[in-house]
């Protein structure tokens, strides 16, 4: 070889893409004349320009040359020509990890650089044969090949043979002129290589396991391996199936031997083994097997079938779509496929199947840490999982009736969907291109360090954005980002061009999901593109059914009506309906939502600009769909006042109005309708309806909390009742022909109204009191007060208007229903002093000023109510028994006929009544000494009781949780059903329970989960109530709670469920599984 030293110029080094010029000169200087000639150095300099990272490629190459020189290996034999050199340098520039492996493994250099290695041209059978021979097994044995080498030698040979083929695949990939085009081929070859490695590992496991000849063992690949779209570095999802190889094997022996084989197989693939220098291949994940990681490692075929028939959740059938026998007994593998396919292709008919899968997908997105959301190539929005999800949902929905769609590979399936008319050709091409591009990016990131990753390079502050908002990009900073520069060079792009292409791809994938899944649900006249496909009637019905529509024919008619014509509303609907259908499908009742959407257009579409507003405000449109598909009450309310829709675009408009703002509105009504009771009543009741609508919309949208919604509703009642009393007083002053009122009149709020806990369906409990003016006689004052109250009640609940009544409940007044509606202050004083019962003292705990004469209210509360409700003397045993008996009698008498005790949110066992009476009893016992307890609200009093150590923290938490849940459930029940008379009753049907559950933070169709959770909380509350209110010992209360729970729990009618320790961690298992 030539002896002169090769000395490239700075310009030569820059043209080659090298950045550290001093280091590059030093490295070229290390290439001694007897190692590589000047001509070869020139070739090297020329091929470095093709490397993703020329600096790293040069450094690794020099290390490899030095290692070969030290071991006296012939460099020209390993790298015989310029083509081999370019191949090697391209690999070294793309994979720093493989370069480090190659320093001490010349066979990897040969595999990557020399075409004669030919391992990248292996087919599946040849790969299997090569790795089986490496472990000393017979490749011609298709069912049960057994290794002949000991564990350490076989594992070393298997791992080394795997990496030799992996190096050749990497070389094939990075040398491709168009890596995006050949991406499916690369994933297929990686999958074939993994299949072969698993076959080899199973052969080793047979060698290491006594009795293996009695066990038929097959490996089912799931996820990317099953779909033959494996990455370079990825967990491998597997399921193991065993059957006896002969009749003499009992089940226990079969499972024991099979488990040993499965454990050894996994150890060979993923664990450090003594005497084995080669690194493990990849991690094996068995989480997709029945019962997940808590289930048996191996099962017989019938056990798999039994699980899928009885216990599998919806997402597990989606996962089965990717199942494929990858190694082991081929006949048993086929038997598994024959067993599982019917489950896969009937899955879309399972209840809430698509909804559950969508929620799983959404949960995955939500679990991504905020700094990584826009870097996640796989799991992020617009990433690989979005493409896979779109394709899988279409397959599962339409594959039930169209067998041509029954494939597992994403791109093959996308092509079949296009050929079948479910996806347009143009959409299929775009989605396929996007998927391949993101896959190549993911592969390039993994190749570099041969570690599992699917993150786009860290761009610092520019890492956030790219979808809804632009990234904060500095081009100079991007050019300094070595990781980004390396990845961009793999595509022949500048760094900023790669960032733009990545973001464009994500946006297109997100858009294509809507276009592909939802736009074809619109009729042909509503399509936006020339090549848009038109679904058959059957396919359209299947798609509407899949997203939760109970009456797909009606839904199709609604969509046709909404998109027909050339009007502005129809044009806007054609644009936004695909997204609207998706959002409605996420609700409990999509049919109701779409019907309400159509009603809005029929009522206001030609006169209001609300559709244009929704087109321009995605958040408002999504909120509206959530409301229309989950609330009958608010759907009806919006159809009466479409201007409320504009509130949904601004959280400020959804905030509850202050008392001052409410008083301004009532004051205006007083001035405008001072002489017309019908119009004034209409304005007050409409105001209440309007504010319920505002607060309901705000509560459903998560803008205000549960407690804020109760306080806001109380303010609305106070403002309306105060204004109504003012109107009535003014009207009667005129009617009596006097200048001033003969009596002052006040409204004392009682019950939940007094506690500022008004819900959407509440009455207003109150006591009305008057006191004669200084110059008025009692008779005139009494007559005046009666007339005022008559007007007040007419305004609030009389037949003066079609607006819903505001019930003013006066049953808590002295003498109850037998007493006068309005009573003088003196009469109240005499009554409470002489005749007040214990329960009336308790009821006064809620008393507060609401409207009217504030001084009169203050005198009543301080002089009459306070001594009774905050007594200094302890309650006697007789008084305690009286309260307890009264509570029991009230619940028995007021509980509606036919309603079970545990189903009533207010009067039922563990319901609101239990919490409130328990707290109020303790107020009666301690508020005389503790001034902080002199509050009207339940939770405020409970907080004080806990702070003063009068109740344990555990009991306080239980009472607080129950009260909050039951109150929210009442509100949710009312908004869901629109029926005030049913708001206190927990429905029996799971569907209606699901509608209520949405308001408590559950997803749609989670009625059973909500019911179980709520009833469990109420049972625990009842236990606390038994101890604190009824005075039972802890043992007595526990026994009573156990009896209640047993009575409320239906007996199983089917085979026993799997072990409870398996069921308990299922939610956590689902979360882990969703992240893959």
Swiss-Prot record:
<dbReference type="GO" id="GO:0005829">
    <property type="term" value="C:cytosol"/>
</dbReference>
<feature type="region of interest" description="Disordered">
    <location>
        <begin position="1041"/>
        <end position="1076"/>
    </location>
</feature>
<comment type="similarity">
    <text>Belongs to the GlnE family.</text>
</comment>
<dbReference type="Pfam" id="PF08335">
    <property type="entry name" value="GlnD_UR_UTase"/>
</dbReference>
<keyword id="KW-0460">Magnesium</keyword>
<dbReference type="GO" id="GO:0047388">
    <property type="term" value="F:[glutamine synthetase]-adenylyl-L-tyrosine phosphorylase activity"/>
</dbReference>
<dbReference type="GO" id="GO:0005524">
    <property type="term" value="F:ATP binding"/>
</dbReference>
<keyword id="KW-0547">Nucleotide-binding</keyword>
<keyword id="KW-0511">Multifunctional enzyme</keyword>
<feature type="compositionally biased region" description="Low complexity">
    <location>
        <begin position="1041"/>
        <end position="1056"/>
    </location>
</feature>
<keyword id="KW-0067">ATP-binding</keyword>
<comment type="function">
    <text>Involved in the regulation of glutamine synthetase GlnA, a key enzyme in the process to assimilate ammonia. When cellular nitrogen levels are high, the C-terminal adenylyl transferase (AT) inactivates GlnA by covalent transfer of an adenylyl group from ATP to specific tyrosine residue of GlnA, thus reducing its activity. Conversely, when nitrogen levels are low, the N-terminal adenylyl removase (AR) activates GlnA by removing the adenylyl group by phosphorolysis, increasing its activity.</text>
</comment>
<dbReference type="GO" id="GO:0000287">
    <property type="term" value="F:magnesium ion binding"/>
</dbReference>
<dbReference type="Pfam" id="PF03710">
    <property type="entry name" value="GlnE"/>
</dbReference>
<feature type="region of interest" description="Adenylyl removase">
    <location>
        <begin position="1"/>
        <end position="521"/>
    </location>
</feature>
<dbReference type="InterPro" id="IPR005190">
    <property type="entry name" value="GlnE_rpt_dom"/>
</dbReference>
<keyword id="KW-0548">Nucleotidyltransferase</keyword>
<dbReference type="InterPro" id="IPR043519">
    <property type="entry name" value="NT_sf"/>
</dbReference>
<keyword id="KW-0808">Transferase</keyword>
<dbReference type="InterPro" id="IPR023057">
    <property type="entry name" value="GlnE"/>
</dbReference>
<protein>
    <recommendedName>
        <fullName>Bifunctional glutamine synthetase adenylyltransferase/adenylyl-removing enzyme</fullName>
        <ecNumber>2.7.7.89</ecNumber>
        <ecNumber>2.7.7.42</ecNumber>
    </recommendedName>
</protein>
<dbReference type="GO" id="GO:0008882">
    <property type="term" value="F:[glutamate-ammonia-ligase] adenylyltransferase activity"/>
</dbReference>
<feature type="region of interest" description="Adenylyl transferase">
    <location>
        <begin position="524"/>
        <end position="1076"/>
    </location>
</feature>
<dbReference type="GO" id="GO:0000820">
    <property type="term" value="P:regulation of glutamine family amino acid metabolic process"/>
</dbReference>
<dbReference type="InterPro" id="IPR013546">
    <property type="entry name" value="PII_UdlTrfase/GS_AdlTrfase"/>
</dbReference>
